[in-house]
Amino acid sequence: MPRLLLVRHAEAAVQASGGDRERPLTARGWADAARLGVYLRESGLIPDAALTSPARRAQDTLAAILQELPPSRPFIAKVESSLYCADADTLLGLLPGPGQPIETLLIVG
């Protein structure tokens, strides 16, 4: 059965010189995201594909998670600009359709 994993970015800095999209993760954020990667690995929730917001904090969260996961079969990672401030309808529109070879999709926003 296909699975959808929705993850909010880890703790980010309050401000960044490049504005909201450029806020990096804090040290705690990196550690928390890595722990989530360990949890996913130990739970057998290994994604086939991942979508992430263009926000730096979301991309960093995904990077920290992926560092803790085993290399997967062909893995698809994509920055999806519509994820920045996305609503439920936007998320639904990003889901793979029938017949697409994605068993577990991870979305980080």
Residue ranges and their predicted role:
Residues 68-69, 95-98:
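Short, hinge-like loop/turn segments at secondary-structure boundaries
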Residues 19-20, 30, 92-94, 108:
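Surface-exposed beta-strand edges and their flanking turn/coil or helix-capping segments
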Residues 43-46, 98-103:
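Glycine-rich phosphate-binding loop signature in dinucleotide/nucleotide-binding domains
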